[in-house]
Amino acid sequence: MLSPMAKDEDSTAAPFDRVENTGSQSQSQSHSQSQSQTESHSHSQPQSHSHSRSHARSHSQSQAFSHFGSAVTPAASSTWGLGEPTPSHHLSSEASTSPAESWRLDEFVTDPGYLAYQEELRCLIFNTAQTAAPTREGTPEAADGGFSAGGFAAPGTILGDEGAARRQAGQILGTGRRLEYLKNYVGEVATWLDMFDSDRAFGIQVPVLARSSPALLYAVLALSARQMERKEGKQTSFDSLELYQEAIRLLTPLLQSRDQKIIPICTILCCLEMMSASAQDWRKHLEGCAALFESFYVHGFSGGLLQAVFWCYARMDLCGALISDGTESTLLTPSKWLPNGASHNEASELFHQSGTPDMHANYAVYLCAKVCELVADRTRYFELGDASGCSSPDELTDRWIRLWEDLQAWTRDRPPELLPVQSIQSSPFPQILFLHWAAISSNQLYHTACTLLLGSMPRPLNLKLGGVTGSAIWHAKCICGISLANPHQGCLNNAIQPLWVAGRLLSHKSEHALLVKLIRSIEAVTGWGTCWRIDDLEAAWGYKVRKELRIADMVR
């Protein structure tokens, strides 16, 4: 239960009731930078909303935040101390020599063929979404798309003879590096698609289905090839482009048939597009998938493969909301992540009913999306005078309190699989080690959601938030520490936006240097374009971090 708290925040009081809270939590208050400086330098807003952002910035900070708190500002140098990075920080060690050192528009993204096929796919998807929707939500069996009952190529389906399709798959894999791409997909790419799915739908079920679906197989190969090209720093001659185009060619008749089996294929192709997309284009690539999920009534509780595909999409949609920096919610509103007719008040029970660590982790994704929705509604209400997302400041306050309580209940009710196996005080960030894949990102999203909520705390409401739990700096350090201690590729991909949220609050140069090296390393290791966020962070910090700067240099 929340209770009034004293004016000055005591970040060392009442230890957080989990093992993460083992380090020093005090923070000094000097050298803080204003949020207005942070926001004015951000380069990450989608272009379609540049007008609203400009309009919002024209309001003074005091006017915009007078009723509903203020943005979290970068805090001062922490008393966590300095020192050499521990072995768990190895991700950043090779950043300065990475072939993918900064995000660039390579020839894949600018190729006229890619752009033409991308637009064709987008139009086909929207046409399918507009004409495919049933008159009511289907049964759970129908919602799974019939994957478990016959896969993509059962006799009599639109793909024809299953044996012929499998022979075609063998011919496809016999060309060039395609078998290598399939191995890379199973061993590397699928692990981050399956990050919140212990049943490994993308790693096991999708490759099995791809044997009888050339369109799905080409989509898998295209995504894997693109990831390898990004890691290798290729600038020309892309196998992924040919594979992408062939996947769309084969997908076209499936889209025209308005079959739910198109959804995994479209989501995988969306992942490929997102891997190289600029921040301005992020949401554009998600819009088609959002329309398909909505029109086919696929949600986070559909069951089977489609449920796994939905949560893969949902994590990308959440990243898009985080990129918008408080101006946008997710494309698919969080209410549509739940079964038809379910309300937010029922969400906790729905997620808990599954009794699995995966769904508890997905609950963290949902709660973070709800926080983004609240922050976006708050921005529109106070900065733009748009009351479409809420009716009054009191409603925003009630939603804020409810979400804060939901987040604390989430961390309190974590199953053993989502708890850290070790948490060690270290400098400049704590080391928080998890064993379960889903534990890594879900705990990081919990800290991200708390950071965002603390940055939009209602005023003049004073709440006792429970020691370090009420410290945005503590949450920011945990976000960074989790990524440094847990080098799972899927979790690193999903960490970029949380690291941006956290990084703006860091003030010491040792923290900045380590975070920049980490972000460079993530791009080099995973192939995802990430380094554009370094420019945003450096703009927020007010200086450029030298690539050769070492933590040891800061100690002197």
Where on the chain are the PLM-derived regions?
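Internal, conserved structured core segments that host functional sites
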Residues: 266-281
